[in-house]
A protein has these predicted regions:
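C-terminal lid/capping helical subdomain adjacent to the catalytic/cofactor pocket in oxidative enzymes
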Residues: 2-4, 8, 33-38, 385-429
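Short beta-strand to alpha-helix junction loop
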Residues: 95-105, 132-138, 176-194, 204, ...
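Helical element adjacent to the flavin cofactor pocket in flavoenzyme catalytic cores
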Residues: 175-247
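A short, basic/flexible loop-to-alpha-helix module at the beginning of a structural domain
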Residues: 19-40
Length: 429
C-alpha cells in the first residue's frame, strides 16, 4: 500500500522545483511542508546495502512494519557489492570494540544463515603472512588480539609449513585463521531481502531521503524521487515530495550516511564524525586455468586497509586488492544519490606487482587485468589509526527514534547480521 502511495505522490509531483523556488521567495517553507503529503509508518531503514537489508529483516522478524528507502534502482549497488566478499574471523580489531564484537558474533550468524538458507559460501581459511623480519612481531600481536576476541583455531606457522600448504607462497612466517571464508554477497543480500519481504517489509527504490525535521509528534523524514533530485541540481535545492512520520529511523546509508544525518536539521552536527573516503581498485588474475592459491592470502595490515591481498571467489577466480587512494569530500549529487566514480585506473596496476610479489614472487608481468573498484566509508584519514564503528542513538544526538550508523567499513559485511541484531534489541524493543 505504501509503495502505491509513493507512486501516486511521484505522479503528482512533476513541478517540485518551481514550487520550491516560489516557496523560497515567499519565505513560506514551513507552510509548504505542512501541505506536503504525509504518511505515518513504523520503521524506516535508509539504504538497501547488506547492513540495511539485514536490519530490515531483523526488524520485520520481530513484527515491526518496515519501509526500506534506497536511492538506487536496486539493492546493494554501493559498498556491499564492491568489496572482497570475505567472511572475517575478527582478529584485526581492538578487544571489546564494536568491530571485534560484531565481527565475531556476525561470523557465526553468517555461517549459520548461509548453511540454512543455501547461500553459496566456503570456509577456506586465511594466511596472514610475514615477508620481512619486522612483520613477525606484528603477527604475534594479531594472534594475541584475535585470541582475546574469541577467534578460534589461530596459530603461527613457520614459513616452510605455510609454503607447503601454499606452494606459490613466499613468507618467513604466517598466521593461520581457519574460520575465515568467502560468501556470494549478492546471493546473501537477495536471501535476506526475500525473508524481509516475506515478513512484510517494503523496499522502495529510486527514492531518496533528502533531510528531515523534528515536529511535536517526532522526527519527520523528507523524501523525493531520485530522478527529480538530478533534475533539480543546479536549478534549486531538492524539495521533499513526501513526508514520512516514523517511530524509528535507521540511517544505514553507507557512504551517504553522514551527509544525510547533517540534512536532518535536528542534530548538532558536532556529534557527526568527520568522514574520509578510501577508494580501492581490484585487479583479476588472467591467463590461468586454476587458482595458484587455495586460501585467502593477506599481508600485514597497512595504513587505510588490510593491504593488497589475494581473494578467491566461489568459482576459484583470483582477485588482488584493494589498494588505498584517499579521495576528497563527496559532491552534492553523489551524497544524495550514492553515485560515485567506480572506474578502475589501469595504470594503478604498476603498484600492484611489487606489493603482490612480496608474497607471490612468480606473478608474471601482464597477468593482471582491471577488475572493479569500491569506496570505503572511514572515520579516520591518512596516517591515522583505524576507528571503530559508530552507532548513535538518542543518548548521543538527543533525537528519539533516530539511529545513525557511521563508518561501517570492513568488517561490515561479516558484522551485518550482528549489527542488525544489536539495533533491533537496543532500539526497537
Amino acid at each position: 500500500m505504501l509503495r502505491h502511495m509513493l507512486q501516486r505522490t511521484w505522479e503528482r509531483s512533476t513541478s517540485i522545483c518551481s514550487r520550491w523556488i516560489i516557496s523560497n521567495k515567499m519565505n513560506n517553507q514551513s507552510q509548504l511542508l505542512e501541505r506536503n503529503p504525509k504518511e505515518i509508518v513504523d520503521c524506516v531503514v535508509i539504504g538497501a546495502g547488506v547492513v540495511g537489508i539485514a536490519v530490515a529483516r531483523e526488524l520485520a522478524l520481530r513484527g515491526r512494519d518496515v519501509l526500506v528507502i534506497e536511492s538506487a534502482p536496486t539493492f546493494g549497488t554501493g559498498t556491499s557489492s564492491r568489496n572482497s566478499e570475505v567472511i572475517h574471523a575478527g582478529l584485526y580489531y581492538p578487544p571489546n570494540s564494536l568491530k571485534a564484537v560484531f565481527c565475531v558474533r556476525g561470523r557465526k550468524l553468517l555461517y549459520n544463515y548461509c548453511s540454512n538458507h543455501g547461500v553459496p559460501h566456503k570456509q577456506i581459511g586465511k594466511l596472514i603472512v610475514a615477508t620481512g623480519s619486522a612483520d613477525i612481531q606484528k603477527l604475534n600481536v594479531l594472534l594475541d588480539r584475535g585470541t582475546e576476541n574469541g577467534v578460534e583455531g589461530l596459530r603461527i606457522m613457520e614459513g616452510y609449513e605455510a609454503m607447503r600448504m601454499e606452494p606459490e607462497l613466499q613468507c618467513l612466517k604466517a598466521l593461520l585463521s581457519p574460520s575465515s571464508g568467502i560468501v556470494d554477497t549478492h546471493s546473501l543480500m537477495l536471501s535476506l531481502l526475500g525473508e524481509a519481504e516475506n515478513h512484510g517489509a517494503t523496499f522502495c527504490y529510486n527514492t531518496t531521503v533528502i533531510g528531515g525535521h523534528l515536529n511535536r509528534d517526532g522526527i519527520h523524514i523528507h523524501v523525493s524521487e531520485s530522478k527529480n533530485i538530478e533534475n533539480c541540481i543546479g536549478g534549486c535545492p531538492p524539495y521533499p515530495e513526501l513526508t514520512l512520520i516514523p517511530n524509528l529511523v535507521v540511517n544505514c546509508a553507507g557512504l551517504s550516511a553522514p551527509y544525510i544525518a547533517k540534512r536532518f536539521n535536528v542534530i548538532d552536527i558536532r556529534v557527526i564524525p568527520t568522514s574520509y573516503y578510501a577508494r580501492g581498485c581490484y585487479f583479476t588474475l588472467s591467463n590461468t586455468t586454476s587458482s595458484p592459491f587455495r586460501h585467502l592470502i593477506y599481508p600485514i595490515p597497512e595504513d587505510g586497509g588490510l593491504g593488497v591481498h589475494v581473494t578467491l571467489d566461489l568459482d576459484d577466480h583470483v582477485k588482488f586488492g584493494p589498494d588505498v587512494e584517499w579521495v576528497g569530500e563527496l559532491d552534492y549529487l553523489s551524497s544524495f544519490l550514492n553515485k560515485f566514480d567506480y572506474s578502475v585506473c589501469a595504470n594503478r596496476v604498476e603498484k600492484f606487482y611489487p606489493e603482490i610479489r612480496r608474497y607471490y614472487p612468480n606473478l608474471k608481468d601482464g597477468s593482471l587485468e582491471p577488475g572493479y573498484a569500491g569506496i570505503r566509508p572511514k572515520l579516520s584519514g591518512p596516517g591515522k589509526s583505524p576507528v571503530d564503528f559508530v552507532i548513535q542513538g538518542e543518548d548521543i544526538h538527543g533525537v528519539h527514534g533516530l539511529v545513525n550508523l557511521f563508518g561501517i567499513e570492513s568488517p561490515g559485511l561479516t558484522s551485518s547480521m550482528a549489527i542488525a541484531e544489536h539495533i533491533a534489541f537496543k532500539f526497537a524493543g
